[in-house]
Structures are given as structure tokens and as C-alpha cells.
Amino acid sequence: MIVRLAAAQYATGCDVDENLDTALRMIDEAARAEPTVLVLPEFGNHLSIYDSAEHCWDVAIDLDSAWTRRIGAAAARHAMWIQFNCTVRREAGRVTNTNLLIDPSGRLTAANDKTVLMGAEGIYLSPADRPADVVDAGFARLGTYACMDGVVPEVPRTLAVRGANVLLNSLNSFALDEASTHIPVRAAENRAWLVACCKIGPLLPPDRLAEFAQNMGVPSAMLRGAGESQIVRPDGVVVAQGPRDDEAVVVADADLSLCGQPRPDGTDVRRNRRPAVYSGLAQPTPVADDHRRADRLQASATANVHEVASLVRNGSMLVVLPELALDDASIGTITAALAGTDAIVVSSRRHSSHDGTSHCGVAISASGVVLHQRQIHRVARHGWVDALGDSVVTLDTSFGRLAIVVGDDVLYPEIPRLAALAAVDVIAVPWASGGEPWDVELCLPERAAENRVNLVAAGPENVVVSLPADFTLWAPERRRPFDGTINLPDIARAHQTVTAEIHPVRSLNRRISRNTDLVDGRPWQLCQSLTD
């Protein structure tokens, strides 16, 4: 089935009535393209800055208000689904940031609150206290979320595992890495179409712009909506995208038969999930134990096992090889080459034991194999595997805590997340994937970013992903000028050997903004569907 999806990006201000008029104007403009579903930006009723709790309450809307009635009438007039986002008055004086979904009859069918509040949003707004509803629209199942809820993987994932195959994301962000990374990766990992609509124009009142720019360490000229609203295919390919700074209606026809399709090698990543392994995702973050973390070290990714000795001699403390690069002889050769060093070499091998044959990641030191990590998910190209792993195993090294994510396990956001919950500083990924463009373009950078871990992967391309020092907003002392991104790591990649510096100690800082932690702030209370 083909449906037309659309996003209408525009600017808003501090006049609630004027903002409603703008929304209605953009709905009418978008209706010319006759979309089935239209998404509007986040914080549609008012800029996300308030003078007081009373001010926040005053500019919020009620669920039965001019906003829902007039947008409902527009939805009925144009016979389309509309998602808009406003702050909403709730019981006991609470105000939430809420995605409101109107059906083509004009009826409000869902009011889903934002789960992960970003920075100053948490001063006056309350987070969601229940999982977002998935709405059966007949032609598709619609899942809604807002901005920061997509910078971490849990909220889109919970929607997808409950059947959503069209994801709707309203944003109010100045971050350029939303459009480049955090938005499209959620489509690909969940095999769903995605419509994302980001605001343009100033995100702050003019009289408070200088204050926020100084306190956040961000140039005032960059505190504008990033635009680039987009429609993303279930393989992570952006099929339509808006401009950076101008009003626009972004439209694309979506073939819903692409939802949930297997990967090129036949692997069904939705069916192959292992909920029983993910139990830690629905539990509080464990209290981190203290372990050594190096400030910096040299890491390499290479397809050539014969380069290992020279890479270690030249200073690499971690070398990652592609999957299945090892046998007994090469393990012995590598062990000998590491004599007198603290270096670690990672790859994988076939491993037979009493319960079957596994695809097993191994870490090798000067004393031999020091870590075994079985692949956790089935992969079609490895039909010989009949024994899977049931947990993420870690190794404390001289440079920090290491986990191996074997092969296509990295495609599942749950596994690197479990590594982060185990206070891992570096993830090694030996793989031979590359079946889809998003594997290297989106997946590897995002797994490092959303978990604040360094990542070294060897495969069709060799990739070293390092955490930057400048990360937390509201930290005005920066080592380098703000580049417009809020959570994009440093990436070195090539088809030949890659060597780059990584920083294990930087994994300690997961605070993306004031009061917003990428790992400790994850909505674990609402993640039961991930483990069912």
C-alpha cells in the first residue's frame, strides 16, 4: 500500500493565538499535496522557555481547546491525520509536552507525553508516566514521539515492538546531528517509515537569547530551529528533506510493504529480538563500580591479521579484526605478538562446546584468550550457529572496561545499551556486515553516541568512533567552537586500516544537557514492552 506522508516546518513565537493561526495556515498549505499523514513541529503553542511555573501553565493548552477543535476541523476538512505538539495542562498542576494525534474525522485519538525532557524543559514540565499509545490507523500503526525521545533508542523501540510501522517525530531542536544521524537511525533499526518535523526560526525569546547563549556555550546565531524535516524509508534512506532555514512542506509517497522487511542476507531483525536477554533495560541503572579508565589510547581496526604485530609495536593498545578472522593458529600467533604489552586484540571465531556451535567474539591478551562473548541474535548468513549468548560479558583492561558486540548484534540497540549499563567504556565490534548503507553511516556512530561509549569496528569498512571532550550543553568552556551538533562523536573510517585516538575516561560524562543523562535518564520504568 502507498500512502503519502508529509511534514510542515515553520517558526513559532510566544503568542499562543498567533501560533495556532500559523499552524492552520501550514496545514492548509500542506493539504495541497493531499497527504494521508501530516506532522507539525514540537512546542507548537509557545517557545519552550517560561518565566515561571505560572507562566508555563498559562501558555499551555487544554485537551479540549481551540487548538484541538480547530486543528480537528482542519483534519476533517482535508481528510488527513495530523500530529501536532503542544504543552498541555494536566491534573494536579502538571504540564506536559504532548504529541496530539487527530484522525481524519477530526477526533483526538492519542495524547502521548514526551518521556525524556531536555535540559531546561524539566524545570516546569513533567515527563510521561505511561508508555505512548500506538494508534491503528487502518493503513498503518502510528507511533508518536518528540525530539529528545529519539536521541535515545528506548521510546521509538517500544513503539515499534508494539507494532508501530510509521513513526512520527515532532522536534524543537537546533542540533544538526538530528537530521544527519538521530532521526534516520530510528527508522532503520525499527524497519519503519519515519516522518520527522523540526522547527525553524529562533527557539528563544529575543530578550533571553544572549543569556542562554552564554550559559549554554552556544553562539546565539545557532539557537535556531535546525529544519531539515525529513521522511525516512525503513532502511534508513532519507527520501525527502526540507531546507535548513525556510518554511517548507516535505512530502513523500511511502510504500508500506517495505516495513519490517528482512535485511539483504535474509535476517529478520524484528523477529530475531531476544527480549529475555534485555531484562536490564526495564530496571534502574546499576550503581557503577570504580575501574580504571585511560585518558586516551591508540586504537586500530584492520582487516589484515598480519598487521597486528606492527600495529601493537607502533602503539595501538586495542586492535579489532573482522568477524571470523581467527583460528587456533592465529590466536597463538597473536598471543605471542602481544608478549610484554597490555594490548588487546579482538575478533571472533567458530566455537564448539557441549551445547552446540556458537559465533564467539574473543579478546586476546599476552596471556591468551581472556574474554568469550557469544553472538546473541541469529543471523541468516550464519546458519551454522545453534548456540547463542544470553548476556553481555565485560573485561576490565589497563585502559578501561571493554565489551565485544559480535557481528550483527550491533544492529540491535538493546545490546550496546546493556553494555553501557555495565559501565563499559569501549565497545569492540568484529563484523562482516555492510548489507545496507545505514550499517556504517548511521548504526556505528549512533551506538557510540546514544550510550557515550567509544567504539572500534572492523568489517567491510574499518571504523574508530571516539567521544569528544565537548559534549554537555550548559558548559560554556569548550575546547573547540560549537559546530551545531549536540551528540555526534568523532569518526575515522576507511576501507584500509584505521588508527585513531579514543578516550575511555570520557564515557563517565553522559550528561547531554542540564538534568538530562543519556543513560541514567533513560525511561526504564516504561520499557517493559522491550523485555516481554
Locate the predicted segments by residue.
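Extreme N-terminal starter segment of soluble prokaryotic enzymes
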Residues: 1-5
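Active-site catalytic loop in hydrolytic enzyme cores
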Residues: 61-63, 89-166, 171-185, 265-269, ...
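Short polar catalytic/cofactor-binding loops
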Residues: 9-14, 301-307
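A short C-terminal boundary segment appended to hydrolase-like catalytic domains
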Residues: 257-293, 502-532
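Ligand-binding pocket scaffold of soluble enzyme catalytic domains
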Residues: 6-8, 135-138, 299
